[in-house]
């Protein structure tokens, strides 16, 4: 039922964003992610394969949102290792570092969306509280064009 409503609104307006769909349909954003034809769920148990793919990208656009701050980092996706219950990101070739509790990730979504009128492609990592932990976006070049090799890699993930 929800999927049909989403598809109907997308037919009416091909440029409608996922967040606008959530507002119009008065449902949570994660329900839109779970039911939109432009979003695919990625298996959490394959997260290491996903991170390996991301390390092959020229750079990533990492986004972390909190209620009072939006953190954006554009850099190579870092190498990491498991220790003390975390995936520890430490890589001299990347400014991205930190400690990820992989066990807290309950859903991963590959999403094609529209942001600020432009196509946007992201990998969203959600916790059991249905809140976004972080997201990785297909990066853009200095002309604000999507980096094609990264987009092709994203599309190959969508095809899995």
What are these regions (language model features)?
Residues 1-132, 137-160:
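Eukaryotic intrinsically disordered, low-complexity regulatory linkers and tails enriched in Ser/Thr/Pro
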């Amino acid at each position: 039922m929800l999927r049909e409503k989403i598809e109907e609104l997308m037919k009416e307006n091909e440029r409608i964003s996922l967040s606008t769909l959530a507002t119009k349909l008065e449902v949570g954003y994660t329900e839109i992610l779970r039911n939109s034809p432009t979003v695919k769920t990625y298996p959490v148990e394959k997260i290491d394969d996903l991170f390996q793919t991301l390390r092959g990208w020229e750079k990533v656009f990492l986004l972390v949102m909190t209620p009072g701050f939006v953190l954006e980092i554009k850099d190579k996706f870092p190498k990491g290792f498991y220790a003390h219950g975390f995936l520890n990101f430490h890589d001299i070739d990347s400014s991205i570092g930190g400690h990820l509790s992989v066990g807290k990730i309950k859903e991963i979504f590959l999403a094609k969306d529209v942001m600020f009128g432009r196509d946007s492609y992201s990998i969203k990592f959600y916790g059991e509280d249905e809140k976004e932990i972080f997201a990785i976006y297909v990066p853009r070049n200095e002309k604000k064009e999507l980096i094609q090799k990264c987009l092709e890699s994203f599309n190959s993930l969508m095809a899995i």
